[in-house]
Structures are given as structure tokens and as C-alpha cells.
């Protein structure tokens, strides 16, 4: 079974990551959730990253707000792929987004949109689908469901237009 760690900088970030946890579980991916701060517990952050691979963690999703250095700190200490989720706080999340996405060469953090843990989960599943065939089918089914929802909305709009 695939395994993903979600690391958040503060417990206050958890509400914005519930969709991430739910989506990973929908894909039957084992989830390991942690609160580790890049600034308040830097030694724990480094140790977590250094030992992630031996714990079977295959992707790390790092979520943080404000000076969102968590993803970068974790990425600096591991070869496990890190996906950053900037969390909206001050400056409408722009500070978190820039801190997460603007990494120096050699220390990549794949970054999704502000507060978009669900996309982080989907991206993690896509990465893992290269190793786990069951995820390929789950991802295809998920995209088919999204497409069907759009088709239904399209039909509804067409019917509303006829009524005008």
C-alpha cells in the first residue's frame, strides 16, 4: 500500500487539510499526519525528513502558512518528493505561496494552489501511480466522475437558457 505523510506547521492548518486526508483515503493510500514546525521544532523537521524513506513514506505533503518554509526544510533533508500546500494567513496567502514555490536550485518543492490540499493528494496519487497500478484505475475513475459532473452542469445550464 502506498504511504504519504502530511506535515503541517501548526494544528490550526488541519481544517484546511481535511480534504487532503479524505482524498488520500479515498485512493486507499496510508496517511501519516504530523504537526512539525520548521521554525519552532527545526530539529524534529530535519529528523522527520531524514527518516521518512526508511519509514516507508513515499511522498510528503507539507502545509504551512505565513513564512512557509516547512516544505523547503523537509525537501533539504530527503530525496522523498515534497508537495507544498501554502496555507492562507496574512497577505491572503501570497506570502505562503511565494515562500513555498520559490525554492533554490536543487531543492524542489512541487507546489499546489493556496489551501488546495485536495490537489496535493491527487498529485501524490499521480506520482505513486507509477509504482502502484491500483492508483491508475482510481485516478481515471476520479477524473471520469469530475467530467460527468461538468457534463451534468452543462446540461442544466442549457435547460436554464431555454427557460429564459
Predicted regions and their residues:
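Glycine-rich phosphate-binding loop
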Residues: 48-86
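Short, glycine-/small-residue-rich phosphate/pyrophosphate-handling segment
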Residues: 91-137
Amino acid at each position: 500500500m502506498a504511504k504519504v505523510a502530511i506535515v503541517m506547521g501548526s494544528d490550526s492548518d488541519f481544517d484546511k487539510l481535511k480534504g487532503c486526508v479524505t482524498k488520500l483515503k479515498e485512493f486507499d493510500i496510508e496517511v501519516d499526519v504530523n504537526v512539525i514546525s520548521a521554525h519552532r521544532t527545526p530539529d524534529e523537521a530535519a529528523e522527520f525528513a531524514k527518516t521518512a524513506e526508511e519509514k516507508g513514506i513515499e511522498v510528503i505533503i507539507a502545509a504551512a502558512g505565513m513564512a512557509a518554509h516547512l516544505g523547503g526544510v523537509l525537501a533539504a533533508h530527503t530525496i522523498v518528493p515534497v508537495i507544498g500546500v501554502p496555507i492562507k494567513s496574512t497577505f491572503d496567502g501570497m506570502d505562503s505561496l511565494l515562500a513555498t514555490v520559490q525554492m533554490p536550485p536543487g531543492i524542489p518543492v512541487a507546489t499546489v494552489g493556496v489551501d488546495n490540499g485536495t490537489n496535493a493528494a491527487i498529485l501524490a496519487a499521480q506520482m505513486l501511480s507509477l509504482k502502484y497500478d491500483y492508483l491508475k484505475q482510481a485516478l481515471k475513475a476520479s477524473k471520469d466522475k469530475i467530467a460527468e459532473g461538468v457534463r451534468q452542469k452543462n446540461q442544466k445550464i442549457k435547460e436554464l437558457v431555454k427557460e429564459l
